[in-house]
Amino acid sequence: MKRCIKRGGRYIVCGDENQAINQFAGASSTAFLDLYNGPKTTQFELPISYRCDKSIIKLAQRFVPGIMTREEVGEGLIRRETLIKDIKPNDMVLCRLNSPLYMCYSRLMDLNIPCYIKGKEGELDELKKLINTYKEDENLGLDWKENGLFPNLYKALIEERNSYIENGYDNIEAINSQSVQYLYDNIQSLIAIGRKCQTVSELKHRLENIFIEIENGVCLSTIHKAKGLEADTVHIICPSLMPMKNTVTPIEEQQEQNLIYVAYTRAKHTLNFVSEGDFNPVKSLNNDIVDTFDYIEDRVCKLFKISYKKPKNTIIQPKKKRGKKINPIIRSTTTNVKTAVDRKNKKSTKNKIMDFLNQ
């Protein structure tokens, strides 16, 4: 960018480090901050939000204390434990992951509420790629009673995880790897769309229309894709997925906090937190990731009559500190100790959200 400026010229950069959320795609989380250190740099603060009402800004201040609202805005409304049926045309629905959005899409279609999923070019092709190798009349196998599309996709998922373990990763690191998580999320998305389908052909047909924008329709989007967008009313589904528990580094933790801030500040007047009662399978993914994969592996092994080498559980006795009782930790032998400790200690952002939701 600097090379585009003539010698002695000046340039203005406007940005918000609290909205740095794309490090996973190669974007530097510190690039904007690095500009502060340049020679003859003048910094101007722009703390006022001209989008959100007061109550929404007050909630966002839990993560970005410096944000302010203009005096003439309304009070705004924040509601907890709302329902999918409360979603109306022109509203926006946000989630940390894709698969709950597909579940919500199916429910809205059942309620005859016009909606679409905001997707990028090629995203539909990625979903189709998973099913294109199967025959049009192939059974989906959602009940696990016979071989079909989804048992085979889950088999591929377990084998993808195992490939990481064979290359030295521990169990949790393998499950949380980008390719395994991406495949799992896509499988869950297909299940949500195909729950009323019988064959691969029917599933393909239903996939064709989900990304076509509908005038006055409900926009369902991941938080990443919603950056820069706004709506009078925003519904957040599966808020327990924010922050994701598979964050390890401080930068990843900060990016998760930034995602929460971005999600809240898409709403102009009303911010709703949808009840998680309809999303229990997704909620359990974040809380019991290892148990979820153990269950999938067990079903795959029984259906295909195969077996994989499972990690054993080991009891680790921590060093006892004077005057303190320390309980033993039971973990997989393939679980990295540092990862387990880091994950256990990262509760601050999560607690901020859950304290609010439990008020």
Residue ranges and their predicted role:
Residues 5-6, 88, 268:
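Short conserved AdoMet
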Residues 1-81, 92-107, 118-126, 215-218, ...:
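Conserved helicase motor core of SF1/SF2 NTP-dependent helicases
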Residues 10, 114, 270:
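Residue-level detector of anion-binding/catalytic polar loops
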